[in-house]
Structure formats: structure tokens, C-alpha cells
């Protein structure tokens, strides 16, 4: 006769803890933010290389040659851990050579790197030329330093002091808070330039009325070239693929290609008055997006309210204003200002440039419409279905899964609508 065995105690059962629910806002794959050197995904290869470097540093020094090699490996290891050190050394070297030379005029070869060139006499007007590329290149290095320094020295400790323990969240907060810092400066800077011009408030007729704009005011040129440096630096990080691509990697890459084409063509062919309003629409909306994401990562109760404001601003700036500019290409491009092709006088506002301008701005609008679709999907999930499943990138999912394998999960589920 078979005996019935008692069931094991519930204390011995392995209860699979329910993962903590996440909000969609912080991980929705949209926007212009590109991962940095300091937040890139650590692959097995990079971890193995780091172990090799540490082994070399632990080896005994037998002669001067070994000592030099150890110093070099020490510098490389520090630079890998703190990516802002190498660009800082370049900046210090150039600035030191420039200011200690006793010649801070345009005759100094370093002047074209540290300051804007082509000032017209003693006026506030600045022309354009090949030296502007030197300025853009140098400030690409500056933005590399600025981003890595702020994220490593300022934002990371700040996030830890706010009791953020997840390595993944700290990295995402670092990226978004730097975006808040940059767009929080560039957005008002661009609005200031627009306010002190005839472009206020997104006056489309003024974009064409004075064409060709061979010169720009000092602050206008600093803003324009600074933006070019910022976007070029981001594009380099994106091209190098230092981060595992997110789901909208192709759209993000396409967005950067179109943006850089717009920057280059508008500057070279004297359409800078068209570029300024587009810069502003991107910066202000990006500021609100990053602010909403940061509040979401910090589990703030204001995250949904902030996200709602962002959605309204995104639709107004990236769609209404940009479509208004796109419509002006069809209606005002021909009628306002000169409309003639003349290579001798650099007159390029003509029947050839019209479709090119329209296609580039239209391509930018298509990417923004795709991201708007993702935004509406998030709103639908939150408001109607209550589903908080993420549209996150592979890198984010993998990183969180790696983290969860080494850290205990919270067995008590928490509901977060935003």
C-alpha cells in the first residue's frame, strides 16, 4: 500500500520574484541623445583587455624601458576609466601654447582653433571660410571633454547621493542630465540669437528676405559653429558604434546624417537663417524629453506631468514649427529675397536648391514623425491599457539582465504609471 508523502514546506519552495515594473518614458528609444564614452556597454572583449592591462601594471619593473611602458599603460588605464583626461590634456596644451605665445591675434596659427575667424574690420560681423573647420574640430574635442567630465565628476556622484543603486540607471541618468545641461544652455542661447534678429518669433519670411547672408553676428556664428561641433562629435561616437545599437539605431543614424547635411549646406550656401530656428526646435524639445526621462529614472511623481508638457512642446516645435518652415519653402522661398542662380556672386537660392532644401527638412520631419508614433504608443499604454512594457534597446535589456543576475530582485511589485 502506497503511502502519501507529505508535501514539502512552503519555506523550501523557490518563489520566483516578480520583477519590478518599469516605466516606458525613461527607456523609450527616441530623441537625439547618443551614448558617451563613459556609458558604453562593457563587452567581454573590453573586460578582458582591462584585465590584461592590470596584469601588465602588476609586473615588476626591470629597467627604464619597462618603467616607461608602465607609465604609458598607467596613462591608458586612467584614460579608459576617466575618458575626459585625454581631451583635457589636448585642450590645456593648445590653450597654453596660444596664450603663452604673446600673440593672441589672428596671425597666430592657433587662433583659428580657439576663436572664431573672419571678423570684418572692427564690426560685429563675421564672414565664413576654411578656418571655421578648425574651430569646429577643436570644439569637438572640447565637447568630448565637457560631456565625460560632467558625467564622471558631477552627475555620477549626484545620482549616487540620490540613492540610485542600479548601475544601468546611473548610466542613463548621466546621459540624460548631460543632455539637460547642454540643451539648457544651447536652447536659450539660440532663442537669444533669434530674439536679437529679424527671425523672431519663427518669422519664416525673414529667413529668405536678406539672402544671401554672407556674414553673421559674433554670437550667431559662435552658436552655429558650436552646434556643428556638438553634432559632429555625437556623430563620431555613433559611427564608431561604441555602444550596442538601440532599436531605432537606423533612424538615429539617419537623423544625424540629415542634420549634419543641413548644418553644412546651410552654412556653406548661406542659409544660416533657416538653420537657427530648426536648432531651437530640436534643443528645446530635447531638453524637455531628457528632463522627463531623468524624473522617471528617479521615480519622481512629477514624471508624467513633465512628460505631458514634453509631448505638447514636441508637437508644437518639431511638427507645427518645422512644417511651417517646410511650407514656407514651397510658398516663400521664391518670392522673398533674391531667387537666382549665380555662382560668381554666390547666389544659390534658386530652382535647384529649392527641392534640395525641401527634401532635407522633409527627411528630418519623417524621423520626427516616427518618434512621435513612439510617443503616442507610450501614452496609449499608460492612459488606456495600463501596460508599462518598454520599447527599449538591446543594450539596455542586456545590461539590466546582467545586473539582475548579480543583484537580488525586489519580491514586492511596485506599480509605477510613469
UniProtKB/Swiss-Prot annotation:
Organism for this UniProt entry: Saccharomyces cerevisiae (strain ATCC 204508 / S288c)
Basic residues bias: start-end ranges: 15-24
Superkingdom assignment: Eukaryota
EC number: 2.3.1.297
Segments of this protein annotated with the region Disordered: 1-25, 390-418
Protein name: Ceramide synthase LAC1
Residues engaged in binding fumonisin B1: 169, 172, 182, 231, 255, 286, 289, 293, 296-297, 303-304, 307, 314, 371, 375, 378, 382, 385
Pfam families in UniProt: TRAM_LAG1_CLN8
GO biological process, one term: ceramide biosynthetic process
Effect of substituting residue 266 to F: Abolishes the enzymatic activity of the ceramide synthase complex and does not rescue the growth defect of LAC1-LAG1 double deletion mutant
Record-linked InterPro entries: Lag1/Lac1-like (IPR016439), TLC-dom (IPR006634)
Positions of hexacosanoate binding: 224, 231, 255, 259, 262-263, 265-266, 269, 271, 274-275, 278-279, 282-283, 286, 318, 343, 348, 352-353, 356-357, 360-361, 371
Entry comment on modification after translation: Phosphorylated; phosphorylation is induced upon disruption of sphingolipid synthesis. Phosphorylation is inhibited by exogenous addition of phytosphingosine.
Catalytic reactions on record: a very long-chain fatty acyl-CoA + a sphingoid base = an N-(very-long-chain fatty acyl)-sphingoid base + CoA + H(+); hexacosanoyl-CoA + sphinganine = N-hexacosanoylsphinganine + CoA + H(+); eicosanoyl-CoA + sphinganine = N-eicosanoylsphinganine + CoA + H(+); a fatty acyl-CoA + sphinganine = an N-acylsphinganine + CoA + H(+)
Positions contributing to hexacosanoyl-CoA binding: 231, 255, 259, 262, 265-266, 271, 274-275, 278-279, 282, 286, 289, 293, 296, 307, 318, 348, 352-353, 356-357, 360, 371
Segments crossing the lipid bilayer: 82-102, 131-155, 173-194, 218-240, 250-268, 274-295, 306-334, 354-382
Keyword Endoplasmic reticulum part of the UniProt annotation: yes
Keyword field contains Zinc-finger: no
Amino acid at each position: 500500500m502506497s503511502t502519501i508523502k507529505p508535501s514539502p514546506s512552503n519555506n523550501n519552495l523557490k518563489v520566483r520574484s516578480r520583477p519590478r515594473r518599469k516605466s516606458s518614458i525613461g527607456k523609450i528609444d527616441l530623441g537625439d541623445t547618443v551614448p558617451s564614452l563613459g556609458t558604453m556597454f562593457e563587452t567581454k572583449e573590453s573586460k578582458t583587455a582591462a584585465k590584461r592591462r592590470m596584469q601588465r601594471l602588476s609586473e615588476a619593473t626591470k629597467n627604464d624601458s619597462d618603467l616607461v611602458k608602465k607609465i604609458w599603460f598607467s596613462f591608458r588605464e586612467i584614460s579608459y576609466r576617466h575618458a575626459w583626461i585625454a581631451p583635457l590634456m589636448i585642450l590645456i596644451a593648445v590653450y597654453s601654447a596660444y596664450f603663452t605665445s604673446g600673440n593672441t591675434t589672428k596671425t597666430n596659427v592657433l587662433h583659428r582653433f580657439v576663436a572664431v575667424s573672419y571678423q570684418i574690420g572692427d564690426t560685429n560681423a563675421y564672414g565664413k571660410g576654411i578656418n571655421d573647420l578648425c574651430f569646429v574640430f577643436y570644439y569637438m574635442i572640447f565637447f568630448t571633454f565637457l560631456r565625460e567630465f560632467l558625467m564622471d565628476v558631477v552627475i555620477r556622484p549626484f545620482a549616487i547621493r540620490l540613492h540610485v543603486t542600479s548601475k544601468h540607471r546611473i548610466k542613463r541618468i548621466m546621459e540624460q542630465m548631460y543632455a539637460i545641461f547642454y540643451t539648457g544652455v544651447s536652447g536659450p542661447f539660440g532663442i537669444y540669437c533669434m530674439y536679437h534678429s529679424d527671425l523672431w518669433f519663427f518669422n519664416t519670411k525673414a529667413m529668405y528676405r536678406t539672402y544671401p547672408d554672407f556674414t553673421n553676428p559674433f554670437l550667431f556664428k559662435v552658436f552655429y559653429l558650436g552646434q556643428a561641433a556638438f553634432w559632429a562629435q555625437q556623430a563620431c561616437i555613433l559611427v564608431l558604434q561604441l555602444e550596442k545599437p538601440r532599436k531605432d539605431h537606423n533612424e538615429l543614424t539617419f537623423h544625424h546624417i540629415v542634420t549634419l547635411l543641413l548644418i553644412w549646406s546651410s552654412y556653406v550656401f548661406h542659409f544660416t537663417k533657416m538653420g537657427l530656428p530648426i536648432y531651437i526646435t530640436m534643443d528645446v524639445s530635447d531638453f524637455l524629453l531628457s528632463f522627463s526621462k531623468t524624473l522617471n529614472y528617479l521615480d519622481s511623481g512629477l514624471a508624467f506631468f513633465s512628460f505631458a508638457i514634453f509631448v505638447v512642446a514636441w508637437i508644437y516645435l518639431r511638427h507645427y514649427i518645422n512644417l511651417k518652415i517646410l511650407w514656407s519653402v514651397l510658398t516663400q522661398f521664391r518670392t522673398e529675397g533674391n531667387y537666382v542662380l549665380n555662382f560668381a556672386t554666390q547666389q544659390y537660392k534658386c530652382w535647384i536648391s529649392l527641392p534640395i532644401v525641401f527634401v532635407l527638412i522633409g527627411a528630418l520631419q519623417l524621423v520626427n514623425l516616427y518618434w512621435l508614433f513612439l510617443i503616442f504608443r507610450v501614452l496609449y499604454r499608460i492612459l488606456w491599457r495600463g501596460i508599462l512594457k518598454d520599447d527599449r534597446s538591446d543594450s539596455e535589456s542586456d545590461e539590466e539582465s546582467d545586473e539582475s543576475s548579480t543583484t537580488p530582485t525586489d519580491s514586492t511589485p511596485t506599480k509605477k504609471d510613469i
